[in-house]
Swiss-Prot record:
This protein's name: Transposase for transposon Tn4556
Biased composition (Basic and acidic residues): 1-12
Organism: Streptomyces fradiae
Similarity comment: Belongs to the transposase 7 family.
Region (Disordered): 1-63
Amino acid sequence: MGGRAGLDDGRGAEGVVRRGSRVAEGAAGAAAWGDDADEAGGLGAGSSEPAAVGQPARDAEHRAASGAGLFGWTVPPGERVSELDRLRRGPVRVSGPQMKRALERAEEIAAFGMGAVDVSRIPPRRLAELSRYGVDGKASLLRRHSDARRLATLLATTVYLTSRAVDDALDLLEVLIATKLLARAERESAKEKLKSLPRVERASAKLATAFQVVFDTTSEQVDTDTGEIPPPKVESLEGMWAAIEQVVPRHELAAAIAALFELTPPLDSDADEAWRAMLINRFGTVRPFLKLLVSVVDFDATPEGEAVLGALLSLPELMGRKKVGPAEIDADLLTGSWRRLVLAAPHLEPGTVDWKAYTFCVLEHLHRMLRSKQVFAKNSSKWGDPRAKLLAGQAWQQARPTVLASLNLPGEADGHLAARAALLDGTYREVAARVPDSAQIVFDDDGRLHFAALEPEPEPASLLELRAAVNAMLPRVDLPEVLLEVFSWTGADQAFTSVTAGEARLKDLNVTIAALLVAHGCNVGYTPVMGGADPLKYGRLSHVDQTYLRLATYRAANATLIEHQASIPLAQTWGGGLVASVDGMRFVVPVPSVYARPNPKYFGRRGGATWLNMINDQAAGLGGKVVAGTPRDSLYVLDVLYDRDGGKRPEMIVTDTASYSDIVFGLLTLAGFAYAPQLADLPDQKMWRVDRTADYGAFQDAARGRIDLARIERHWEDILRIIGSIHTGAVRAYDVIRMLSRDGRPTPLGDAIAHYGRIAKTLHILRLADEPGYRRQIKVQANLQEGRHALARKIFHGKQGQLYQRYQDGMEDQIGALGLVLNALVLFNTRYMDAAVNQLRADGFDVRDEDVARLSPFVRHHINMLGRYSFQLPDLPGGLRPLRDKTATDDM
């Protein structure tokens, strides 16, 4: 197959340069857990005991269980926590010593050999549930189970932790390099530069004054009256110095020159030299963990990353030596100012290099290549090789027909691309023909496209009256009652099942679940929801929290709410569920966490995280993802779309400008979505064409980019395999997008996908120009999401709205609770607003359909979210509470 640049090039499977493993393989050929997990009593669906285990696997398990002291779940003498507690706790602080401890933890867990046990026959969901129970459950609860059940939980937990510990270590390495090394060195360098600025200014002024004298006294100057050229004012060097010293004494001039040599970089330097020089002084941060890094993490690389990986593996041999020669390093990696710092530092002896500077040069390259997946970890799930996960060979051939049919994509590109090119050409001509009559489109002197601002949609008196009447009729309730009532309508509480799978359902479990949702969703903790009744006692809350509330059960409950929201006539008036938007909501994380990132604009001096969530045009939240810091939304949009909790598959996707890139445009279009980002920087957007000679009238200058159809066609099979792998869930879109770019530039395959995306991007811009209604539809959907985020802020009011979670799992769980409370409150509002509209119609009120479509389900004046909470649902004989008199006062 031709044109496989970026995927395969004969360097091993999927184009990967293979290296020998540096992690113990464990028992070779470990048998699977029984031929049939269900029949053998294994970890199949609904089973709580392990299946028969092959002898090599059994030996490995018992070594881990007994030899390591984990199986007793007890606290060793003199210790505060059990061995299990110690090993399942990941790093939280970002520092060199923490990095060393994270690698030691990964090494210790890998030594159990559980990574070699074949668990392929165990249902992944069951394995995930057991490992989650083992990671989060209290040791006292785990001790209550039988030996077989504890062994199964231990094995699932250790298998999970084997790769998770490496994930945690590399997460910490990434944030350590980015924030504590590179960013801190840049900040300190900038401070030093600012501090030295007055000296530089004074020295520069003296030099400028002196050289002005030189020019004035030595340059030829024409007499404008006579045209003659008089002789220079000075005829000797002594005379010139005499003239200079009249304005700047010689000793001050010498001091100014010395100051500039001290405070400014050499001419052949670059802008990075100052902070890189400061970075070298922080070698003590990386010294403790460098040797562990290359021995614990089983690194591998693509051909492009092989040189960096080789340099990384050589670093332990250089550390601590007094003299390292140029032949012992890879000089090709010394880009920019690194060459001077490594090879020509003032303190170096002839024939030696600065190996500390070289170490940081390699780490800077490693950081970049880890993020682009050109260097990866074979014993990690998050930092592994996405190319190895792509559908290939027989697996791709089997999936290919189904993928192409599902996405409506052809196996051959020529006809499809010709049709797309014809559509683009025709749209250009149609819109260009309407430009003279359009007041919406404006071109500046450079031919750049501008839109006239959308006028605010007027709110007629009928809408204001309807909104006031409906809002006045909504019953006044406390948030716990909302949750209990929604549970009674939907049965969403039934989605919360015990992770042990064998536990009898607790009495009044719905009350406990509602209390926990308030505790987490309102960010207030247990204290305000605790009570004397059994469902609200601390022990019950803690037990249910650990065994019933987890990401999988939040998602299952949310799917039920989404389904019920779609069935309400009022929600159907708002939309058909086929338009969705994706946007981020920011949370300050004030506690130390590897999974928080700094951003002064959003988080001040703290770290933070972003909840990237999706909402459809029926106001239902379809799911979301918690990511560290404030990364570009475009990296995660596809993953959020494919990992939704429930509801119809959206067809049109609205995002803000931060979610836009040509590659993302291409991937979303290939995946069957109509991508509609808001383009705040529209005049700077390049429009694209296929036919360079076509005359597109007013768009002639704006359409200055050319789409290369031949490039797309050359890579078509790989493009199909990429989107097929994303569509089937074989690989995360985030990893693919990272893989398709290197150093900010697309790979050949990424460039082909970007060219495909430029067709859709240009069609989107043309539609924005031609259809004000399309622009308004995008704006309405974006405003809908902003309204949801505003309501979320009101709900998540405790602890100043800050997220006190150290680990990503905890963040996802708490934000999962917030998302579920949001959807429950929106469902409550929608159903009662629908009833209010029906009542108003029955009473003869002037209710217009266009006004009903503009009602918002994010009203909150009638919901009490503060104080201590009551979890007793009143009798509702009619199924719903009585609507309030629309003329009643607003007192709750």
